[in-house]
Amino acid sequence: MTTQDELKRIAAEKAVEFVPENEYIGIGTGSTINFFIEALGKSGKKIKGAVSTSKKSSELLAQYDIPVVSLNEVSGLAVYIDGADEVNHALQMIKGGGGAHLNEKIVASASEKFVCIADESKYVSRLGKFPLPVEVVESARSLVSRKLLAMGGQPELRIGYTTFYGNQIVDVHGLNIDKPLMMEDEINKITGVLENGIFARDAADVLILGTEEGAKVIYPCQG
């Protein structure tokens, strides 16, 4: 039986085919992305540089001599490659288990195409089993948590974690996310929220799923 890491690697290696040469690209964060950076580094493909969403990804890119650039230095990105904690059939996602979802949304929005890579366990019919990360300003944490509680969620502070921007993460369990776009907007309207981990406005254009049968390329289904 194929292990989860092997499935992640299968998806990551397939994703290299979606990277155009001589362009700037965006790189996400997480264990599946670590496999992708390794595969890209070993592929021999030449890119102008990569905008990274985390220190860990930047360090790994440097190991493979892939130039890391700031988003402020480029006018746009050809493609953004990232993983997901959950992804549905419309390629809407929950992300942010690693706490980098604000940076990830910024870089995704600057990219012409979003390619999501994941193992098959992340492909779900409905979002919400994975707790939803919400980045909050520390002084508003209790206020935001009460609002999230009123929405039907069970907020829990991520103890000992601070985001790249110095904020806190509240992980919300039990939310009804049958309308991801509406829920994403509703949470972001709460004063004190910087960003939440629903990627509906910035849904993926392509999903590469690592399965027992190999890599499957999936496009959004709105039905």
UniProtKB/Swiss-Prot annotation:
UniProt EC number: 5.3.1.6
Keywords, sorted A to Z: Isomerase
Gene Ontology MF annotations: ribose-5-phosphate isomerase activity
Disulfide bonds: none
CDD domains linked: RPI_A
UniProt GO cellular component terms: cytosol
Protein's pathway: Carbohydrate degradation; pentose phosphate pathway; D-ribose 5-phosphate from D-ribulose 5-phosphate (non-oxidative stage): step 1/1
Domain of life: Bacteria
Keyword Acetylation: no
Family the entry assigns: Belongs to the ribose 5-phosphate isomerase family.
Stored NCBIfam families: PRK00702.1 (NF001924), rpiA (TIGR00021)
Record-linked PANTHER family: RIBOSE-5-PHOSPHATE ISOMERASE
Subunit (UniProt): Homodimer.
Full protein name: Ribose-5-phosphate isomerase A
Organism, as annotated: Neisseria meningitidis serogroup C / serotype 2a (strain ATCC 700532 / DSM 15464 / FAM18)
Lineage: Bacteria, Pseudomonadati, Pseudomonadota, Betaproteobacteria, Neisseriales
